[in-house]
Each structure stands twice: as structure tokens, then as C-alpha cells.
Regions:
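Long, low-complexity, charge-rich intrinsically disordered regions
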Residues: 1-12, 79-83, 103, 112-164
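Extended, charged alpha-helical interaction scaffolds
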Residues: 89-95, 101, 105
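Short amphipathic alpha-helical interaction segments
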Residues: 27-38, 100-114
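Acidic (E/D-rich), amphipathic helical modules within compact regulatory domains
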Residues: 17-61
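Short capping segments at the starts of secondary-structure elements
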Residues: 13-17, 87-91
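A short acidic, leucine-rich amphipathic alpha-helix
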Residues: 20-24, 94-99
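Short, cationic-aromatic polyanion-contact patches
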Residues: 1-3, 17, 48-75, 124-146
Length: 164
């Protein structure tokens, strides 16, 4: 059924956007809207709405996990998290160098990761050293929902994941 197709797609890709679901299972906007509303009302799925994006999750995922998975679907936050998992604590400029994006871009997403309580920092000699708050949980979510990250990452990250 269409409902099962939608649920299956959201399970495989938590944090998937409306348009992505529409394209992957070839449903029109109106038809998908109808089923999304129905599944939400029945408590099967949850929608995380921001000003520009709606993301869908199966209801068994916690709010915290949803935040992490949403960030992992974005290139720069994913790169920041992988960098911080590979290197225990880094200063801002070190993150910028590793991620390879403009400092303003890294700053924008790093602030979001800190606000989401996924990343934190400690001040050392007037500089902030950033780190992943719950390494094991983040590593597990990456392994479960983004195995490509582990496959494409350095051996260092693979070693870290297996040691946690």
C-alpha cells in the first residue's frame, strides 16, 4: 500500500524531506500530503518542521536522535561531526581546515550543532576546543543511518567506531 511505501522510505531514510519522498515513490504532492497527515494523526510518523524544511521520522526515534540524523543529512554538519569524531578536541580553525569550507559556513553549522547539544566546547587558554558530546551515540547513529560515511572515511574513524 502507499502508506507502507511511505513508512518504509522514512524508516530507511530518517529525516527525509517531503520532496525526496515524493520523488522516490512517485507520488503527487496532494496524495503524499494526504497520507503524511493521516500517518501523523495516527502517531506513526513525526514531522520536524523548520522555516524552510519539513523532515519525516518514524515515531520510535527520540527527539535528540532526530536532531542528530537531520544534521547528518547535511554535508557540512556531517563533515564537522566526522572530523570531531576522528580528532578528540579541535579548535575552530582546525575544524575549518579539516572540513574545507569557509569559516563563516563552519561557524554557522557549528553554532547549530552546539545549540542542538550535539557538540560542545571547553575554553582552554582563551580558545574554544570543540568535541562531540555523546561520541558513542553519534557513532552508532552514523553507522546505522549513514554507513557510507564510515566506508568513505579514514581508517582512523573506522577504528574509533569499532572501539566505542
Amino acid at each position: 500500500s502507499r502508506e507502507e511505501l511511505i513508512i518504509s522510505e522514512i524508516k530507511k531514510n530518517p529525516g527525509i524531506r517531503f520532496r525526496e519522498v515524493m520523488e522516490k515513490i512517485s507520488l503527487s504532492n496532494g496524495v503524499l500530503s494526504y497520507y503524511v497527515r493521516k500517518l501523523e494523526n495516527n502517531g506513526v510518523i513525526r514531522t520536524q518542521r523548520t522555516t524552510r524544511v519539513s523532515r519525516f521520522f518514524i515515531n520510535d526515534m527520540t527527539e535528540e536522535e532526530s536532531k542528530v540524523v537531520s544534521r547528518l543529512r547535511q554535508t557540512t554538519p556531517k563533515a564537522i561531526l566526522v572530523t570531531l569524531l576522528e580528532n578528540d578536541r579541535l579548535e575552530f580553525q582546525e575544524i575549518v581546515a579539516n572540513v574545507g569550507k569557509a569559516s563563516a559556513t563552519v561557524s554557522f553549522y557549528l553554532t547549530k550543532l552546539v545549540n542542538d547539544e550535539i557538540v560542545s566546547y571547553k575554553k582552554v587558554d582563551l580558545k574554544k576546543n570543540y568535541f562531540v558530546v555523546e561520541k558513542k551515540r553519534i557513532a552508532n547513529l552514523i553507522t546505522e543511518y549513514h554507513p557510507d560515511v564510515v566506508e568513505n572515511a579514514s581508517d582512523n574513524l573506522a577504528d574509533i567506531m569499532s572501539s566505542l
